[in-house]
Amino acid sequence: MNAASPNSDIALLAEVAEAVRLQEGEMGVRAILQAFRQLAPAPTRAISRRTGLPLPIVAAVGNELRSRGLLGQERPSRLTERGLALAAELGVELNLDPDCYRCGGLEIAIPSVLNEAVERLRRIMADGPNADVSLDQSLCTAETKVRRVLALIRAGVLPGGSVLLVGDDDLVSVAIGVVGDVLGVPLASRVGVVDISTDILDHIADTASALDLRVDLEQHDLREPLPQRLRGQFDAGMTDPPYTAEGTRLFLSRVVEGLKPGAARNILFSFGAKGTEEMLEVQQEILGLGLVTHGMIRNFNSYEGSGILAGTGFLQHLLTTASTASLVEGTYEGPLYTREKRSRQREYECVSCSARFPVGAGARWNSVADLRDAGCPQCGGGPFRPLQLVAE
């Protein structure tokens, strides 16, 4: 490859952003370059965590940088000489990690006394149901479960308060019991769980019984209003909804229905990394519900496996106000999950043989999970790397 002028290299940022339809534009590509410069050698997941950009987007940008000679072919990856020169031209050479060394920027550190809780939750997770990616599920790690309980403690909800979990595939209800058991203190006066999955509810029931933990379980499709017996009953709520604006509106509406009347009720809301325009829609839904943001922690939630996130998500601490009200009083009938809204296909590359396949609505595989389950049709292997969106 011939040497390029600094100006032509900088112009590559715009080309890469356009190639992957990056909502963050040149600044998003610049952030990814800076992260590779600071963290090298770095896996895609670490770059996603540092930049806050979705994992598939970071992977697609990485492939575009490789094709232009800015990023090496090895994994974990580092910038090439040309990439380092571009980083210098952009002024992003500083190698400094300002995150807290103890909590890693998560604000909440798990004390050593709760290491036992983490280990117990890992064992409980191993016996539990798998994530259902069609429902936008990605199971959070045992450490994240404990941090969520600690977040409820920091918010003043626990000990002594009541908590409604709108969807609990992450088993936070169980985590409340395990943490309380390890500390020797009953944490919640009441824990309510509303979930559509009987598998999840059965697992919670079995585990809670062994812990002598009382959990109020309700099998319920959240497209329908919250059951009357749960309305207006809880001090606080927690939800990790489908990763769409519609999912935000519906699940937070059901949380609001379950809270006791009054301002300053706590809601802990988890969500995955999305582009700026999608995040704007999500935050507009939150404001539309009459909720205000009391705090936000990036990368607070870490997820296992290969679900819709396969990485990290933020925790947003919300408070109710005098104007807080559900936006979905009756039955909800619109799109809810990512698969119901996705109209563009994305190309995926088999790591084993480099064959490429479109995935998405109208393709042979509706999701990368379907492709992964089937295996590469060319070599039978995998795994698969996300590439750019297929042009319409």
Language model features with spans:
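SAM/dcSAM-binding transferase cores
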Residues: I10-M27, P43, F300-E392
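Short SAM/SAH-binding signature in class I
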Residues: R231-D240
